[in-house]
Amino acid sequence: MKRTYQPSKLKRAKTHGFLARMATASGRKVLKLRRKKQRAQLTVSSER
């Protein structure tokens, strides 16, 4: 059985990136809550 986590920067950004979060209402809610908690990183996009 192969391991389930096969890292890919592109897939990670497309799924969890800033634009992906902004695209849906629930994603915007995620950003809002992360801003409220003053997270250093809002999304994985800021890893670059």
Curated annotation (Swiss-Prot):
Keywords: Ribonucleoprotein, Ribosomal protein
InterPro entries: Ribosomal_bL34 (IPR000271), Ribosomal_bL34_CS (IPR020939)
Single GO BP term: translation
One annotated Gene Ontology cellular component of this protein: ribonucleoprotein complex
HAMAP family: Ribosomal_bL34 (MF_00391)
PANTHER family from the UniProt entry: LARGE RIBOSOMAL SUBUNIT PROTEIN BL34M (PTHR14503:SF4), MITOCHONDRIAL RIBOSOMAL PROTEIN 34 FAMILY MEMBER (PTHR14503)
NCBIfam families for the chain: rpmH_bact
Family statement: Belongs to the bacterial ribosomal protein bL34 family.
Protein name: Large ribosomal subunit protein bL34
